């Protein structure tokens, strides 16, 4: 458990992590507006894996604008990110990928909480949720908490075969739900 200054450092890192996402999206939009890239037809988010300060979907979904959204929570950052892309690119299909199972059952319990929040946000914003946790083929039963398993190199991050497995699943889901 983290206490005192360690917790403060973790919270600041979480805040920085969410703000990095915001900066990347703002940079992407600026590059599209400058003509460096075409407007996207599809935008895929992979959300929740590194988040600790979850917030709630209920709080993140308050109001119609993004003015009051707390981007320092996973829920608020996700809403801000998704809605910003939808506002700038109304013809774009947005997909949100959930975290995958890890080799650590406790981490997976936290991932399930994140997925419940992401599912509620996706429903409210009418975007497709891609359930990598339940359907990509990576299961905690074949992974190690902090070592190499079937598809995870360290209990958390997919190795090359794991990346390929996830990629095929995500591509199939996009193909099956793109209209």
Predicted regions and their residues:
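Stable alpha-helical elements in mature extracytoplasmic
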Residues: 24, 28, 70, 74-81, ...
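Catalytic His-Asp segment of secreted/periplasmic serine-dependent ester chemistry enzymes
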Residues: 99-179
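A generic secondary-structure signal
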Residues: 31-34, 80-88, 173
